[in-house]
A protein has these predicted regions:
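Symmetry-related core transmembrane helices of the 12-TM Major Facilitator Superfamily/SLC fold
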Residues: 172-188, 376-391
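Structural signature of the two symmetry-related core transmembrane helices
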Residues: 83-97, 283-298, 380
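Helix-loop boundary and gating motifs at the non-cytosolic
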Residues: 12-62, 215-222, 229-243, 250
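Helix-to-loop junctions at the C-terminal end of transmembrane segments
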Residues: 68-80, 165, 264-280, 367-368
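C-terminal transmembrane helical hairpin of 12-TM major facilitator-type secondary transporters
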Residues: 280-325
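Cytoplasmic helix-loop-helix junction between adjacent transmembrane helices
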Residues: 113-148
């Protein structure tokens, strides 16, 4: 963005290689993860596990991310960013191998938590790497492009699963290949100079609290985005099955949500940079996208009897939810660098993950027991609270 500090080490040799390696490694790793996630849910349903229990398994991924994220800046401070990224790529591969070699649900639960820990580390570091490597004046563009690519992985993973078939013996091998390729590309990330604030940045729980207090509305936007983009996406296969869709169509709901994220993230990031006041522009766009979520979610009251409504609804959830996260990350990238950037990114990921954890943890039971009342009520409440808070903040800023 135009307000990005020019002192950032983006002109250092290897910054282009850094951007490329982070983009490509994340593309392959997340494609594997988002192919694996619906595959696990469908395997659980095939084993006649209840929808409520399957939803709790989906929530365990977010629980792992939620537990690890507060400590991401501490781990990074101790190990360094490259070593931590390498660790975060190895752990999901080990977890995937475990899923395919055992049928013990207790082991699966432990592996899901471990993979969640790794996802939390990589998530924070990948976002911070993009902001660190981006050329001055183009941070919004690159963060938007990265978010678009992440949305693309939502499409690639489930689409591969639907194409190969959830019951195919080839599906596990494709997952392993994707994760292994992502691990190999992570090794290409170049070294960075030492962080200028290694000894002064607030890290850990103290740093997280400071970031939340300083920018509460940005973090609330992250929560709403996480609820509708990632949290609900994790239970969309269950939602589709409950609505009477087939297994492949239910898995494709995740692709539709991801397609929405893919199409909107980059334009939202570029548009945010065009306002005379970028900060006010970001808040305006956040308010508009949250209002769109609220409008689309009203369709959940009728989707049980008009199942075609689920397709545009989940597309808007993915598009607007992803845009909220992208705009919040651009806001952080405009203000922070070094370990402070890692820490503030961790806070955004934490609130985003909390939104995902709430959505996946509660929605499974609500879909199973109160599809037409409880699930819509929860979703509408979250959207309404987010919109009210953003409207209040925007009006205060306009005065």
């Amino acid at each position: 963005m135009r307000t990005m500090a020019t002192a950032r080490q983006t002109d250092a040799p290897g910054s282009k290689l850094g951007l490329l390696s982070v983009f490509v490694s994340t593309l392959f790793q997340l494609s594997g993860v988002f192919m694996l996630s619906p595959l696990i849910l469908l395997m659980l349903k095939k084993a006649e596990v209840s929808t409520t229990v399957a939803g709790l398994f989906a929530a365990s991924t977010w629980l792992g991310i939620f537990i690890m994220t507060p400590f991401a800046s501490i781990v990074t401070q101790k190990m360094g960013r490259r070593a931590t990224m390498w660790l975060s790529s190895v752990m999901p591969l080990i977890a995937a191998l475990g899923y395919f070699t055992t049928n013990n649900l207790g082991v699966w639960l432990a592996l899901i938590l471990i993979a969640g820990f790794a996802d939390g580390l990589r998530w924070v570091l990948a976002e911070a790497f993009i902001a660190e490597f981006a050329p001055p004046g183009q941070t919004g563009r690159y963060i938007g492009a990265f978010a678009t690519m992440i949305g693309l992985t939502f499409v690639i993973g489930p689409t591969l699963l639907a194409w190969i078939g959830p019951d195919s013996n080839d599906a596990p091998w494709v997952v392993i290949t994707l994760l292994t390729t992502g691990l190999a590309c992570t090794a290409l990330i170049p070294l960075l100079p030492p962080d200028h604030d290694t000894d002064t940045a607030r890290v850990g729980l103290n740093g997280l609290w400071h970031a939340v207090v300083s920018h509460p509305v940005i973090m609330l936007a992250g929560f709403v985005g996480g609820f509708f983009e990632l949290g609900l996406a994790s239970i969309l296969p269950l939602y589709g099955l409950t609505l009477g869709l087939g297994a492949s169509a239910a898995a494709l709901l995740v692709s539709v949500s991801g397609a929405g994220s893919t199409l909107v993230a980059l334009p939202a990031g570029v548009l945010a940079d065009q306002f005379a006041s970028p900060a006010l522009g970001r808040r305006t766009l956040m308010t508009a996208f949250t209002g769109l979520i609220l409008l689309a979610t009203s369709a959940s009251l009728f989707v049980a009897h008009h199942s075609w409504l689920v397709w545009p609804m989940v597309c808007i959830w993915g598009a607007a939810g992803g845009a909220l996260y992208t705009l919040a990350m651009i806001d952080i990238g405009a203000r922070e660098k070094g370990l402070s950037l890692v820490n503030s990114t961790a806070v955004l990921v934490l609130t985003y993950t909390l939104g995902g954890l709430v959505a996946s943890g509660l929605s499974g039971a609500l879909i199973e027991h109160t599809l037409t009342v409880g699930f819509p009520a929860l979703s509408l409440t979250v959207a309404a609270i987010g919109l009210a808070a953003l409207l209040h903040t925007k009006r205060s800023a306009d005065r």
